[in-house]
Amino acid sequence: MTCSNPDRASKSILRARAWLITDNKVGMLVQCRGVVDALHLDYVHKQVDPKGVRRLLSPWLHPAKSEHFGEIGSAFAPPWPDIAIATGRLSIPYIRALSRWAGARTFTVVLQNPRTGLGTADLIWVPEHDLLRGQNVITTLTAPHSFSQDRLAELRKAIPAEIAALPRPRVAILLGGPTRAYRYAKADLDRFGRALASVAALNPSFLVTPSRRTPMELTNVADVATRSRPRLLWAGGGENPYPSFLAHADVLIVTADSINMTSEACATGRPVYVFEAKLSNKHARFHLALRRYGATRSLPDGLSHLEQWTYTPLHAAPQIAAEIARRWRQPGSGLPLSCS
């Protein structure tokens, strides 16, 4: 899709109005917010929830007529945004409809493979482990998120008292959970428990947080393995201390199912161990690339010491934001195939 709005070259992107279009999955909004935060834009979040056959057959169908797309008073109505960013298959019918209604007025961006072709948006981002490529496709090694260098630096300026009281080294354990492509067999849980117990034997403290996808059996494994050591284990009440855990951990352990959490861990510049069960081909390519880059290492069944290594922190959001800004100001310009 070629954009030809002549007004953009003279308009600051900082004055652009943005829409974020996602379903109700937190991980989708995390990626969109990371990019729009890097652009320093105000935005309106448009959460979509197609029903029935439209949910089943997304991303290929149009929004339902009952949603009155484009009509005054509906959730999707003029004035159209300058920039729209969509993530997830349920959002694709809406970004495609927006392109038809707004035309060159709106610069459209899709994060992740839309499955509906390169013409879906003006710009498409996919992680390197996705094989989609094209003139309007850019890639980065990790996924975008909101933990920028500035945000992490700000978090590190003031350490919460309960974290400061923990002896170092502080090991963060970031728990994901099963997905359609990723399952935890009992043997995997047992192996994870042994690995964490070997870490506990090295006398660190722990910062443990599950996610919304984390099943009780996975949380229990981390609970049992770390309870002999000083720790903070977030049980779901109140605000998740995850941002402070990221900022103040000396070493991080993350389950391989979560590309978002692994990407966030690799923004810290701290050693990241990844616990892997059976991986899909995409996940395997992602984690292999991170190991080759030097950000992560596989969590072994047993550790005799906590290894230390360094790498340049990975931040995808500002790279994607820079490409959006360049493309938005220079309609029709070519895009590099990679921002890594």
Enumerate the language-model features and the residues they cover.
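Catalytic donor nucleotide-activated moiety binding site of glycosyltransferases and closely related
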Residues: 203-238
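Short internal beta-strands
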Residues: 45-47, 126, 206-212, 276
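Short, charged/polar "capping" segments at the starts of alpha-helices
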Residues: 26-29, 53-55, 117-118, 181-182, ...
